[in-house]
Amino acid sequence: MTEYADDLEVERSMKDRFMTHHAESPFVSARIDGFHGLRYFPIDERYRVEARLERVDPPRESYLRTNRDGQATMRYLGDLVFMINGVECRLRLFHAGEGVGTSAFVPFRDGTSGTESYGPGRYLTLDLTEDDRYELDFNRSFNPYCAYTDAYECPFPPAENDLPVPVPAGEQAWSDDRNPATPQTAMRTLRSGGTAAKPKVTPRKSASTRAAAPRAARRRPRVAARPSRKR
């Protein structure tokens, strides 16, 4: 194995420990039994690509639908442009808003969504750069917490972030008898439209887990960091 692959395996092992034992793990907080580790595609460096950001100036407010048919308020920063297996791809880059740090996130779907990976989509997180150059490492793509339990509210990718190619890299679908990998309610919400025109609900931004979680387990947008209470 390469040093890169070794490092990634260490990150994944740390994330499994976090998911197994930490109070802010969705499996611990939602009391989901039977966790035996997350599932991943084989590590493949072809899905570690360079991208350039085509900025939207000024950034625009955007509303992403959530698994509870709500909306998450984001700032749309621009489009990341890159190549995968000879195909030009574009993904919208989002930020949670002013005063929320320098981390941005990219929700996306691809040709594996709904089969080998979580149907409503996966996430990448990025640290913002000054030169608008980014590395997109899809081997580090991960599921939102709502992939494991409906105790969490998570934004879905907009229609513009549906990639035209399969990306068999990163985290695969989680599934057990009580938490199917592709919840039908989530898929109905996704099909109703990715990006909304007007806000109806702005989910409460919860406290970050960055201080407590290992690096491999931190990669979550802030709107999905903690479950909201059911009414």
Which residues fall in each region the model found?
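A compositional/structural signature for long, glycine/proline-rich flexible linkers
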Residues: 1-100, 109-112, 118-125, 150, ...
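Mixed-charge, glycine-accented linear interaction segment located at domain edges/termini
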Residues: 143, 155-157
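Poly-acidic low-complexity segments
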Residues: 3, 137-139, 220
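Polybasic, lysine-enriched low-complexity intrinsically disordered terminal tails
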Residues: 185-231
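Immediate flanking context of iron-sulfur cluster ligation sites
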Residues: 133-149
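A short, structured loop/turn motif at beta-sheet edges
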Residues: 126-134
